[in-house]
Amino acid sequence: FLHPEFIIQFVHISCIINWSEETKGNVKAKIKELNEQFEEEKGVSMFGTSLGKQWKTYDSDERYSTASLRFNSADIETSIRKTEVVFEPTETGKEYTIDQMGDGLRSLFYISLVDSILDVEGQMVREIEIDPEHTSFNRKPPILTIVAIEEPENHIAPHLLGKLVGNLKDIAGKNNAQAIMTSHSPAIVKRIDPENLRYFRLDRELLASKVRCITLPDEERMQDQYKYIKEAVRAYPELYFAKLVILGEGDSEEIILPKYWEAIHGNTDVSGISIVPLGGRHVNHFWRLLNDLEIPYITLLDLDRERDGGGWGRIQYVLKQLIANGYDRNVLLNTTDSGILTDAEFEGMAGWNVSAITAMQTWIAWLEKYNVFFSAPLDIDFMMLEQMGDTYKATLDTREGPCIDIAQSGKKERITKIENDGEIHSEYETRILKDIKNTLKEEGGDGHTYSPEQQKLMVWYTYFFLNRGKPSTHIAALSQLSDEELKENVPPVLQRLIETADHILKGDKNENCAS
């Protein structure tokens, strides 16, 4: 029995011996000869070829571009046990070992190694089928291998995750393997077909996890909706990890809502809020998906009063989607004055008088009890302009802004000057009528439900939001304001939405139902 200290000293002494060049040359030649003999063995060659091929699909780092099997020992038994993989950028370049890799590349290589083994096992099966008496290996491969990977995002760089997911899909496509991966990373989730996802959520009452499939519209009957929802959940995978999802119309909501929330309650990421733009389309499918996953949500839609399909049409659309999503029709359509709407009355809602603004506002307030809010009277861009128009105008320099030609003076005047002077120009009145049309679209109304000030604001709406990029306009305006100034300038509907979101996150409001 040798004391460990003696062994350590012996190894240390052997490492500092001044070996002759002849001895080092002879050993190197023998090892090279041994490696060549080793690589000629059919089973080794098969595995080495597979390893090199599979590794190229995982990594693109030039230092480790070529992977091959090598060993270094005095006898065949020990050599085989000490077989290792080496990497080299070229045939004559420096060799690297696994130990010299970072954690991420090392993790990636181990997965590549599993991929190689599965590939070889497939070749083993074919060998057994062709000639069972002469095979490269003396064992039968397993019928099925389950490859389970836990949260690879912890060790693998983001730019390599896509390659990893692609290769795991290839592994899962093999006849002898199944791949299972857990992840909290949106970068991974968005690369997985929603139909292949299984969603785990902790049930705090049962103290156990519930497992669910992802609910998508029926592909056969609703092909367009199926494609839209499928791509939407892939584009916004953050919703799976959210404590609360806010469904908005588009890019503007993604800029404005976080800005106000952060001014009032802090970072949306810390709060666990995900804002998903759905463009007002297929809202009931999003609701069904989030209901099935038991993720609470709030919806913010444009009212689009006097636009085609807006106003009463938009309210009717939301009511229909709520009914389709399982809400009680008799409760939803119960009015204070005349009881429950008949089918005929409900079907005719889109044609109700758009000037009945008080009645429309009553329905809007009712739908807020179902966590459906409206940017009124038009959309969130117009609402922000109405709330803090001067802030948006302050982002322009003296050479910017809408202008018109004044026939009387023969000059081009800026709208800002005309508004400040208070002079009446027929050209200005004509411009207002033109931009009312631009704002409400070709099939829209004449703007009679809007006040004179709101009609004038449509000139600025056209300039800021129809002729320029919405996100950049909002960013430029909101970045001028401090958190305190933002708090003082919250549109009332956004104030109510934020309060509702806060109550849901604190657990003191029923989620997605009238209370």
PLM feature spans:
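Glycine-rich phosphate-binding loops of NTPases
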Residues: 1-29, 95, 220-224, 322-325, ...
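P-loop NTPase switch/coupling surface
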Residues: 1-12, 57, 61, 265, ...
